[in-house]
């Protein structure tokens, strides 16, 4: 479905989105295989908002031919709370890796937080191949040192999937100290070598927090009495048909970022 997506200011300025068409062409001639990926469209749209005036008000607009027009309310730009630090702590018997954050908001900043992150780590294979098979002439060859070295130095990555939100309403200060946001076993492949986590923090208003909190409860529990997705109302409205329900919540804000590196190899947690 081809759609038009743009950000609109309260004064009428527009910033148009670009749909993502990813082209990957990859050919490996060292071995016997030949990979080629054709261009594809993911129906994702990117809007460069870096030059927007933070003192303005903005909304998201979507137009889908034959389906409808969708808009969000105009919102002021919320400034993200700074991430003061990222740290880690090993659990009992060094069996669990716990990642924690500390953050402090200034006077007037939101007390509602949302996070997402990206993980990158060295993914060295536990068993290295020594030979290769060429199906064209039915021959077996030996992998060179250069090839084995390139296979041994691999990287893997992952993104957060869980909805991570929190608020400081019950605290005396708008501050988080060593808040635990991620845990995983130290036996995990992520701890074999160098590990990097990049954390992104964005502020939410109360309505946005309630939306994501309801979504997280529905995602974690499910069950007979869990709310249906269309019962969790966001702030995306269809202006051409009020009976249509759009899922999602759009916030207007900046975001802060912090990165931590952990050398799992130097920790020597388990003899691998």
Roles of regions detected by a PLM:
Residues 1-272:
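A sequence/structural signal for flexible, mid-protein segments enriched
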């Amino acid at each position: 479905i081809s759609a038009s997506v743009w950000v609109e200011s309260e004064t009428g300025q527009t910033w148009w989105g670009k749909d993502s068409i990813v082209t990957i062409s990859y050919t490996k001639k060292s071995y016997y295989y030949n990979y080629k990926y054709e261009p594809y469209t993911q129906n994702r749209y990117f809007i460069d908002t870096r030059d927007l005036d933070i003192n303005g008000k903005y909304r998201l607009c979507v137009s889908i031919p034959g389906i409808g027009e969708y808009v969000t309310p105009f919102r002021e730009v919320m400034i993200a709370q700074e991430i003061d630090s990222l740290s880690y702590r090993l659990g009992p018997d060094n069996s669990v890796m716990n990642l924690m954050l500390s953050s402090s908001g200034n006077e007037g900043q939101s007390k509602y937080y949302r996070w997402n992150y990206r993980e990158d780590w060295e993914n060295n294979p536990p068993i290295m191949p020594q030979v290769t098979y060429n199906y064209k002439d039915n021959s077996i060859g030996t992998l060179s040192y250069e090839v084995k070295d390139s296979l041994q130095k691999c990287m893997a990555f992952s993104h957060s999937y869980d909805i991570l939100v929190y608020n400081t309403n019950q605290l005396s200060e708008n501050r988080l100290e060593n808040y635990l946001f991620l845990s995983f076993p130290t036996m995990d492949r992520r701890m074999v070598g160098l590990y990097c986590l990049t954390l992104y923090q964005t502020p939410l208003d109360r309505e946005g927090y309630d939306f994501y909190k309801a979504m997280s409860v529905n995602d974690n529990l499910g069950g007979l009495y869990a709310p249906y997705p269309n019962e969790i109302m966001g702030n995306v409205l269809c202006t051409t048909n009020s009976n249509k329900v759009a899922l999602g919540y759009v916030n207007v804000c900046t975001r802060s970022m912090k990165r931590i590196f952990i050398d799992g190899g130097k920790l020597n947690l388990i003899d691998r």
